[in-house]
């Protein structure tokens, strides 16, 4: 009837006298229409009377308190009225607020509770305020007991200016004095339990300090755990400085020390901060007494790679060996990149990057430069993970060598390349790998170089040796003439090794026949190159290897994809469950092959790349870069002698290849990002992060985060330039990219924590690159393979063995009885055998003989 009233505890009597209704009720919360004794307890309460529905009598309490302060109820309400003055609310039980009456339900004595807050009686500590926000309570504290000897349950709250349930049943009613209302406490209320002493308020400050001590205890971490490991975001390591620990220097030769980069907040209550091991010092000076953070830290952020090898060495080992952990040598260096907009494949934020000894030590805003650090201002520019180009061929009949190829890579923002090693003549694959490694040691390369081996036959033992001993985790199938059964066996073996198989989508035998056909037709120029390699033939090759790869549950990658039909075959295979991935050629993103039909032979010959360029392919390639998972863009960098190629008598013998390591990232940015097809994060994924995941480099490479290798590029997206071979690092005279305008500039490329390229010049000083060993079993490729092997999609029917041998059949029927099975001798004779011999059959069966009718 009155939904805005508090729940009724009990009703003593109800009388009906004419049109008046008398109801005696007791409320859970104060109401201006409930009976309440006067402050003196002597005057009689007035019962509200309803004379009729149209005529309302204003009722007031004669014993209104002279102090003008009402006692509190226990039920808040947000309603307000201009007629009725608000009363206050208290969270104390009614029995605890009563001074003159005792509760009908006895209340146990409780120990004094702490000061009451607005949070249901539980005080919020400073640590909880840090976690959940908020400040000090604005609710008035309860008044002290008039009699200190009274139990806590007898306390009375005197503040009556808080919200109270609205009294406005009807207009014209006045508020009654609702003091000393008694209600039994709720035994299930957590706040009442605190008052009764069943559970004291927890000491959040003490628990918070103990938890932080446990987190910051270096002994609580395994050797491979890095407390400073970060997730993307601008708050990584914010305001982190190191505390001076002289005692740790004596132990740096014994074992690595682990320091946490946890920023301790100030205490809200007293404004003081704790000073513990691993925390910042009080003055916040990270270079106090000339001591740098690296001097106090042995190995920065140490992580374990997939094969269990540590990715960072101790400081003592680095000083003795001169190895910076990235393949190069040199003294320890400190670099601070300021005000950069950091772009990872999943986040964009503004922060500074502190690099020490080739490892990213801190990512946070407003970092202070340590003593002796080199500062690189990147304001207004992007900081991206350095590019990873997984298909270069500078060691295969190229005018570039490893040194020149690496310079081209860093000039384009690439910090790591995967060089494809091809055996020469009768050279074994193991010998070819060792030959290239020797070249890497002799050359002053400025970027990281990993190797991928091209195989021409199924060499099982040599492949196993390369994976286990030489740091190889991928193989390239280029023109391998294997039958399907041998190819399936090869895929099974590669899967067991945990390596990635990469397939060049070209049927060499059929292509040779088509080239001869073109030459007979008089097509000798560059235009014959794409016509001798139809898209359908390329798609058929892709479809075939994807089917075999799916049968073997082996991850495969199709390299140098340049046709829409090949992409369609890959997408179809993935829909069928194949673990197939695409490596898009940067040349196919740039040009559509129309230049091959140009009248200018020199210009047309420059477009004779490893892959035939197709008309209408660039848009399809960009679409694949924006949608397919683990798709990468490769350059296929193999510059050739332009004069020799032009002088070739036909396209079949002309050398194929072009530059691309320096132009790859700029072309993808121009064609895909600037056109709005992909964003900057996807750009990072297709040029760096996805390749790092496929070749088991992630998260050491392909990401800007604490503990990752300091390989990054400072990218100016507001710049503009025209690509020209004369200003490129490659030795090729002319390129298919000549004359292309791009709206991006590589300001600086950092490899291994050192600036290798800046403002258009390659730094010849200390190199930080070198051979990069790759571990097998990338989790981004083989995690699904293990599950597929456990739950093979095969069906097996369990059948019980037959207890007796099946009886022989005669004339299509089982022999039912006897040792004699009579064959049919007449066409109309029944094939049913009733048993017995023919001599004993009755001649006159019931119903008469049937032979007489015939």
Swiss-Prot record:
Changing residue 168 to K: In yad26; in the PLM neuron axon, increases the number of unc-9 puncta close to the two original gap junctions and the length of the first gap junction, also causes mis-localization of unc-1, loss of unc-1-unc-9 co-localization and a reduction in the number of unc-9 leaving the gap junction. Transmembrane segments: none annotated. Residues 240-257 have a biased composition (Acidic residues). GO terms for biological process: axon guidance; chemorepulsion of axon; establishment or maintenance of actin cytoskeleton polarity; establishment or maintenance of microtubule cytoskeleton polarity; motor neuron axon guidance; negative regulation of microtubule polymerization; netrin-activated signaling pathway; pyrimidine nucleobase catabolic process. Its main location: other. Residues 57-114, 130-327, 794-854 are annotated as: Disordered. Gene3D superfamilies: Metal-dependent hydrolases, Urease, subunit C, domain 1. One of its GO terms (molecular function) is filamin binding. Residues 193-202, 279-298, 816-827 have a biased composition (Basic and acidic residues). Keywords: Cell projection, Neurogenesis. The keyword rRNA-binding does not apply. Expressed in ventral cord and nerve ring (at protein level). Isoform a: Expressed in nerve ring (at protein level). Expressed in the nervous system, two amphid socket cells and weakly in non-neuronal pharyngeal cells. It is found in: Cell projection, Axon; Cell projection, Dendrite. One of its GO terms (cellular component) is axon. It comes from the Eukaryota. Residues 58-68, 75-97, 802-811 have a biased composition (Polar residues). During neurogenesis, plays an essential role in axonal guidance and outgrowth by regulating the polarization of both microtubule and actin cytoskeletons. Establishes the asymmetry of axonal and dendrite microtubules and the polarized sorting of neuronal proteins. This is achieved in part by regulating the localization of kinesin-like protein unc-104. In neurons without a distal microtubule-organizing center (MTOC), also controls the organization of microtubules in dendrites. Isoform a: Probable monomer. Isoform b: Probable homodimer. Isoform c: Probable homodimer. Probable heterodimer composed of isoform b and isoform c. Interacts with unc-14 and kinesin-1 motor complex light chain klc-1; both interactions regulate unc-33 neurite localization. Interacts with fln-1 (via calponin-homology (CH) domains and filamin repeat 18-19). Isoform c: Interacts with vab-8 isoform a. Belongs to the metallo-dependent hydrolases superfamily. Hydantoinase/dihydropyrimidinase family. This is Protein unc-33. It comes from Caenorhabditis elegans.
